[in-house]
């Protein structure tokens, strides 16, 4: 729900404005959606409109279509090319190449080494044509689609690492909101405060309270009973840490 609503403030990787907006659009439902979001919300994929294509197919607003023989490999992304690993699998299954050769194809496509690609293209097209009983023209179309996609696809293993870390970050925010936000505020910049407070108010999982001279300290103070965060004394304009320390000393000594 947090990802779907774009409540991603201070979240690892998902906290950017662009990816937050894409999460609202995509409405991720599982870790696979989060991995896809990381991979598809990138310049190359976006220039080819694959990020929107994924959402439309996911929501059933557009028919999911597969090239012959690609469904098992592309079903998790609704027929959309999303990862470099998919390119390798397609070269292996459709073109009869070894995994080492498939990785060579991936590298050559990314670096646009057309001479190196030619030998693999000459093997891929007839193998795919004869094995899957498609036409020569269709085989060439599929090869060209793979070639085009490979130039901008992201590494799925990297995307998975980012997505899992982002999910863990979000899980902590949901289940331990007071602890999460107390740390977030401690390391936040001044321009972060308003966004953080806005999200806290939207989620309603805890509250941020103004400075209380009897409770507040130099850092945000947690009150578990009230599910509240008390603003730091140093958050008051023109009250530096030295002055705040003197205030706390006076409070401790004289009440």
Predicted feature descriptions by range:
Residues 1-255:
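Noncatalytic, beta-rich nucleic-acid-contacting surfaces in large DNA/RNA-processing enzymes
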